[in-house]
């Protein structure tokens, strides 16, 4: 039975794990790292780079290197958070055909789901390389506070990557699974997850294989990226103060500043001071300019203090919704790279009144939890029951634009809830059901997930028709809504697809694009491998021709030289063709066989001559000796 893998699709880094016997195991990627940067880059010649190779060239190709795209997934272009991000990233955020926020590279638009799919493909390939078999099914994690549109977009990304997404699981819940799988005694834990782009807090009761989420809260636009940008803004301001030059519009400089900010932030988690040194950051009429600045931990903490404080309100709300006090929390589990920051740990300690648990790897624990959930679905992990919740209230818009809740936030999923509504006007023959998600009292202030019409109602006075609206949330947190006229039995239902979102046709097209990209990538890799083999053969044949060319005929020498020239020409072509290189490599191997034969004969002749010489040299000094065979029995006696 093919393995189901667990993937933590992160804002900054992604990670893949699989069940290995009874334990979950993180799989190393082709570069030998346990996590992969969630970055995709497109070079000028159209080559696509994913992960570490994309990160390595980001400084020289800032406008075509896409990162932190998870923050845009499932969001409309007009979203205020998207507006904020537009001014902070070196690449272009554009309006997609469906009104969603898309990204642009080399003049071509990509949906965030497409870019996420490229990262998922890399995770899929990493797992396939380790397992030695095709992988087609996965469990993928999302921030607990993701709304329906964001969850659906993540599922779409999986489909584009060629994966059947068996389950979408919340990141804090996955972390709790990995942390508590071997815990038998009952505990109430808080999972504080501050990652690269999102923040989640979940309160769970765990024990004896049951993981019950009591409440969840968070902020889907708060994470390490914001900390980095805060530091970049400070560096830009300091440089302007000292040199009178504004680096804000210099995309190359901004990318270098971002890398330096991330590095400094990480260093300051273990040291009190670091130095940021960026030579030749820019130049003016007087010559090149360099940025050198000492940064203390205290300064960094003062710059990001409000960001850390923003995590407190969601924590308090989650405690309140779960009906517990901070003192009743037995353990606080830290997840996400930003939880390594001493200031964050200090705030968590003050809030919960206890030292947070640091026994799990914050970068890997979510992927491990996803792999455990994959094991549960596959039947490899027994006696585990996971009860998650919906993070936001769901309802419909009713008379006066009021948001009428059908399912309250923190309701255990899967769940189903029905409520009966009626018409607002006489002789109304159709009703529009507008489905929203959020906590505000007016529907317009919440996230509109989608809408549909129930038509064909018989003309009646207002208030008479009985329209039953049913919400059905599956274990992935994805919503299906139906409306039924009790009088006529007419029913209309939809799987909620965000008013933007990707249509089935869009997804199908992107799947085909991804497949053709995979074929292109394979072709490119084959060309590189063929080229490497060819260059190695050219080098060894040229050396042999130089050393032993006089041992073969003039015609053979010419044939070998011509074959070398033809193969060199094939490897140096702009669009290297793997099949052409392989054919010409084969030709060179065949024509150089006579050269190989000549080398072999020459070596044999040398070896024979050397043997004769040593026999002649040592002939007079040969000593004849008598020897006596000692049997094992005699040896034992003498011992």
Swiss-Prot record:
Gene3D superfamilies cross-referenced by the UniProt entry: 1.20.1270.10, 3.30.420.40, Actin, Chain A, domain 4, Substrate Binding Domain Of DNAk, Chain A, domain 1
GO molecular function: ATP binding; ATP-dependent protein folding chaperone; unfolded protein binding
Domain of life: Bacteria
Residue numbers carrying Phosphothreonine: 198
CDD domains (UniProt xref): ASKHA_NBD_HSP70_HSPA9
Biased composition (Low complexity): 604-613
Induction statement: By stress conditions e.g. heat shock.
Matching PROSITE patterns: HSP70_1, HSP70_2, HSP70_3
Compositionally skewed regions (Acidic residues) per UniProt: 614-631
Region of interest (Disordered), ranges: 514-534, 604-639
Keyword Zinc-finger attached: no
Keyword annotations: ATP-binding, Chaperone, Nucleotide-binding, Phosphoprotein, Stress response
UniProt keyword Lipid biosynthesis, yes or no: no
Record field: compositional bias (Basic and acidic residues): 514-529
One Pfam family recorded for the sequence: HSP70
Similarity field: Belongs to the heat shock protein 70 family.
Function statement: Acts as a chaperone.
Protein name according to UniProt: Chaperone protein DnaK
Species assigned in the record: Rhizobium etli (strain CIAT 652)
């Amino acid at each position: 039975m093919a393995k189901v893998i667990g993937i933590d699709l992160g804002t900054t880094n992604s990670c893949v794990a699989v069940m290995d016997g009874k334990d979950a195991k993180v799989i190393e990627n082709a570069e030998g790292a346990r996590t992969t940067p969630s970055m995709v880059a497109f070079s000028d010649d159209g080559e696509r780079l994913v992960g570490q190779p994309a990160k390595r060239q980001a400084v020289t190709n800032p406008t075509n290197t896409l990162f932190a795209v998870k923050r845009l997934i499932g969001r409309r272009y007009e979203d205020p958070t998207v507006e904020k991000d537009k001014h902070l990233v070196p690449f272009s955020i554009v309006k997609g055909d469906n009104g969603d926020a898309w990204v642009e590279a080399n003049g071509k638009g990509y949906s965030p789901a497409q870019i996420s799919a490229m990262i998922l493909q890399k995770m899929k390939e990493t797992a396939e390389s380790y397992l030695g078999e095709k992988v087609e099914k996965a469990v993928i994690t999302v921030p607990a506070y993701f709304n329906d549109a964001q969850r659906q977009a993540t599922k779409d990304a999986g489909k584009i990557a060629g994966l059947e997404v068996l389950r979408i699981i919340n990141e804090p819940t996955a972390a709790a699974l990995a942390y508590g799988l071997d815990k038998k005694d009952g505990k109430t834990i808080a999972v504080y997850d501050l990652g690269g782009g999102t923040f989640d807090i979940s309160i769970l009761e765990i024990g004896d294989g049951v993981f019950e989420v009591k409440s969840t809260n968070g902020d889907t636009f708060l994470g390490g990226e914001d900390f980095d940008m805060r530091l970049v803004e400070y560096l830009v301001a300091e440089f302007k103060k000292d040199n009178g030059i504004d680096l804000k519009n210099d995309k190359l400089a901004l990318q270098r500043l971002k890398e330096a900010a991330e590095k400094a932030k990480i260093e300051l988690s273990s040291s009190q001071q670091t130095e940021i040194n960026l030579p030749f950051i820019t130049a003016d009429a007087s010559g090149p300019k360099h940025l050198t600045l000492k940064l203390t931990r205290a300064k960094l903490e003062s710059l990001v203090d409000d960001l850390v404080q923003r995590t407190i309100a969601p924590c308090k709300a989650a405690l309140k919704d779960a009906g517990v006090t901070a003192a009743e929390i037995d353990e606080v589990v830290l997840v996400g790279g930003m939880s390594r920051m001493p200031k964050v740990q200090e705030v968590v300690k003050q809030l919960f009144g206890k030292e947070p648990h640091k026994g799990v790897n914050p970068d890997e624990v979510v992927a491990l939890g996803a792999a455990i959930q994959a094991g549960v679905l596959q039947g490899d992990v027994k006696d585990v029951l996971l009860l998650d919740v919906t993070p936001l209230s769901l309802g419909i818009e009713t008379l006066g634009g009021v948001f009428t809740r059908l399912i309250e936030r923190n309701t255990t999923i899967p769940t189903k809830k029905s409520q009966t509504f009626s018409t607002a006007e006489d002789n109304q023959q159709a009703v529009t059901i507008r489905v929203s998600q959020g906590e505000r009292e007016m529907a317009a202030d919440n996230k509109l997930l989608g809408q549909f019409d129930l038509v064909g109602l018989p003309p009646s006075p207002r208030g008479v028709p009985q329209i039953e609206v049913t919400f059905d949330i599956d274990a992935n947190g994805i919503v299906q809504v139906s409306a039924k006229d009790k009088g006529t039995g007419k029913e209309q239902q939809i799987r909620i697809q965000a008013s933007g979102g990707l249509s089935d046709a869009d997804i199908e097209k992107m799947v085909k694009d991804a497949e053709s990209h995979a074929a292109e990538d394979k072709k490119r890799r084959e060309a590189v491998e063929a080229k490497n083999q060819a260059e190695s053969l050219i080098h060894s044949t040229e050396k042999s021709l130089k050393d032993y060319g006089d041992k073969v005929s003039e015609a053979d020498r010419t044939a070998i030289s011509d074959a070398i020239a033809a193969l060199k020409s094939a490897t140096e072509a702009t669009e290297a063709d793997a099949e052409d290189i392989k054919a010409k490599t084969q030709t060179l191997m065949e024509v150089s066989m006579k050269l190989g034969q000549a080398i072999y004969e020459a070596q044999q002749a040398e070896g024979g001559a050397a043997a004769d010489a040593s026999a002649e040299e040592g002939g007079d000094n040969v000593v004849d000796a008598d020897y006596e065979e000692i049997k094992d029995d005699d040896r034992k006696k003498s011992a």
